[in-house]
Amino acid sequence: MADDKKHDEKRDDEHTEALRLQLRAKFDDVAALYDAVRPGYPVELYDDIRALSGVPDGGDILEIGCGTGQATLPLAQRGYHICCVELGSELATIARHNLAAYPNVEVRVGAFESEPLPEAAFDLVVSATAFHWVAPESYPKLARVLRPQGAIALFWNKHIAGAVDGGFFDRIQPIYREHVPEFAGDWNGLPSADELPDETAALAATGLFGPFTVGRYPWVARYDAMAYLNQLNTYSDHLALPADRRQRLHDGIANMIDGEFGGQITKQYIAVLYVAQVR
C-alpha cells in the first residue's frame, strides 16, 4: 500500500507540473489582448523598488516573464539596462515593439529555468505577476545571477475585497457555479489586503535571500462588460476552458453587469511588492 501511495503521489505531482506548464504557456495565445488590457503598476511601487533594493543608476536588471512590457517600460524609462526572459514568442515580439525606443532593453524568448544566463551579472532580479510560474527547483539560480549585495523585487496586482465593487463579485458566484463549478469552490468572499498569502514563503524558506520588505499600493479599475470580459480572457484558467463553456459563462457575467450594475463595475486592487537582498 505504501508503494501504491507513493506512486499515486508521484502521478499527482507530475499532473500538477504538467498543468502548470500548460497554463503558463496560455498567455501567448492572446498576446495582443494581453498587451491591450493587462494593467500596469502604481508609480510609487517603482520608486520603492529603487529605494529598497539599492539598484544603482544605470544598473543591470533581469526581468522574469516580462509579458508585453507592462513593468519593463517604467524601468527602462528610469535608465536601467534590462534583460527580459519571456516564455511566449508572441508576447516577446510585442514587448520588443513596445520597448523599441530603449536600446538598453533586450527581450529573449525562453524559460528562466533553462535560459543560459551569466553568473553575478545583475544588480536586481524583478518579476511582475509572473514569479508564481517559476519552478522552485530553479530558485538557487536567482542567487547565482545576482552580484554581491544584489536584490530581488517581486510584485503582483491582487484583487481584494472592497466596498467599491457593490457586491458584484459575490453576485456572480451562482453564474460560476452553473457554468464552471470547478472555479467556484467554497466561495468565502474576496480576501482583504491583510488576508493575502505570502507569495515569497517558499523562496524565503531557501535562505538564499534576506528578510523581505513588503510594500502595498491600493488602486481601483473600472470596467464595462466588454472590458471586464477581455480581462477574463487573459487569465490562464479561463483560457483553458472549452470555448462553449467560456462563452456561456461570459454571457451570464455580461448580462449581470449590464442588467444589474448599470453597465459598469469597479474592481479593488492592491499591488504588493516584496524586496530582499541576496545572502
What is the predicted role of each segment?
Residues D123-E137, K158:
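A short SAM/SAH-binding and catalytic strip from SAM-dependent methyltransferases
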Residues L62, T68-S114:
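Class I SAM-dependent methyltransferase SAM/SAH-binding core
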Residues G58-G59, A120:
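Nucleotide donor/acceptor-binding cores
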Residues S114-L124:
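A short acidic, Gly/Pro-enriched loop at the edge of an enzyme's catalytic core
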Residues A2-D57:
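Conserved class I S-adenosyl-L-methionine
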Residues R147-P218:
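Conserved catalytic/acceptor-binding region of the Class I
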Residues S138-Q149:
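A short glycine-rich, Lys/Arg-flanked "PGG" loop and its adjoining helix->strand segment in the class I
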Residues D4, T68, G189-R279:
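Conserved Class I S-adenosyl-L-methionine
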